[in-house]
From Swiss-Prot:
Belongs to the small GTPase superfamily. Arf family. The lineage of its organism: Eukaryota, Metazoa, Chordata, Craniata, Vertebrata. Gene3D superfamilies: P-loop containing nucleotide triphosphate hydrolases (3.40.50.300). The keyword Plastid does not apply. The gene is Arl5a. A lipid is attached at residue 2 (N-myristoyl glycine). This is ADP-ribosylation factor-like protein 5A. GO terms for biological process: protein localization to Golgi membrane. It comes from Mus musculus (Mouse). Keywords: GTP-binding, Lipoprotein, Myristate, Nucleotide-binding. GO terms for molecular function: GTP binding; GTPase activity. GTP binds at residues 23-30, 66-70, 125-128, 159. Signal peptide: none annotated. InterPro entries: P-loop_NTPase, Small_GTP-bd, Small_GTPase_ARF, Small_GTPase_ARF/SAR. Lacks ADP-ribosylation enhancing activity.
Length: 179
């Protein structure tokens, strides 16, 4: 009886899941947010502060916060961490010079108490650009295999075409079913 009640409750419970989208400036965070919400590319300018959109996938609601990635804004990322269930880190696969900065920011975030239960989705963006870093290279540079206390997934994508974005959302949906 308890299992039946739980399944019925899930059908009608429209809980919202908080997601933050972070990454260095010019990684493609805002483009990804608006691909999710409008399924189209919008002209963007550097995000000062944040953008927020509600995305509904199969009756599951995600409240997605796109947070500015400029160096001066990164110290304020932690103000968005409370109640976050998923962190999406967008990596510019063409930016070899700053991959170490991405790694530093990633591990700072993962050490924060408010994110201890958050799932981690890494979008390796701009995979359409010649000579970009592969998913394997990014995974190695970010030392993802050393992450033991968070569920994580890395997904190749191209924000401009939307390629790979649905697979990332599917991974997030699969993590919700496990809980």
């Amino acid at each position: 009886m308890g299992i039946l009640f739980t399944r019925i409750w899930r059908l009608f419970n429209h809980q919202e899941h908080k997601v933050i989208i972070v990454g260095l400036d010019n990684a493609g965070k805002t483009t990804i947010l608006y691909q999710f919400s409008m399924n189209e590319v919008v002209h963007t300018s550097p995000t000062i502060g944040s953008n927020v959109e509600e995305i509904v996938v199969n009756n599951t609601r995600f409240l997605m916060w796109d947070i500015g990635g400029q160096e001066s804004l990164r110290p304020s990322w932690n103000t968005y961490y409370t109640n976050t269930e998923f962190v999406i880190v967008v990596v510019d696969s063409t930016d070899r010079e700053r991959i170490s900065v991405t790694r530093e920011e990633l591990y700072k975030m993962l050490a924060h108490e408010d994110l201890r239960k958050a799932g981690l989705l890494i979008f390796a963006n701009k995979q359409d650009v010649k000579e970009c870093m592969t998913v394997a290279e990014i995974s190695q540079f970010l030392k993802l295999t050393s992450i033991k206390d968070h569920q994580w997934h890395i997904q190749a994508c191209c924000a401009l075409t939307g390629e790979g974005l649905c697979q990332g959302l599917e991974w997030m949906m699969s993590r919700l079913k496990i809980r």
